[in-house]
Design a protein with these regions (language model features):
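Ubiquitin-like/PB1-type beta-grasp interaction modules and other compact soluble beta-rich domains
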Residues: 1-72
């Protein structure tokens, strides 16, 4: 199972999907597009304590983390 982890002001929400199930992968890809379109940054782990920002959906990533755009003021 792969996970999309969405960080927001309420904490985090995890959405899991089976990479072998086409319908679930399509739903996860739509969620990826919706979140990145709303300004979230998507990243995958690239090593211990490291992450890499991604711009397109990778269904083979074990975990994709989404975090909101930082706003200063």
């Amino acid at each position: 199972m792969a996970s999309l982890i969405v960080m927001d002001r309420t904490g985090d929400t995890r959405h899991t999907f089976d990479i072998q199930d086409r319908a679930e992968v399509e739903k996860a890809e739509r969620r990826f597009r919706d979140l990145t379109g709303a300004g979230f940054t998507a990243a995958v782990r690239s090593g211990p304590g490291e992450q890499r920002v991604i711009r397109s959906f990778d269904p083979t990533a074990e975990e994709t983390l989404f975090y909101p755009r930082l706003v200063g003021g």
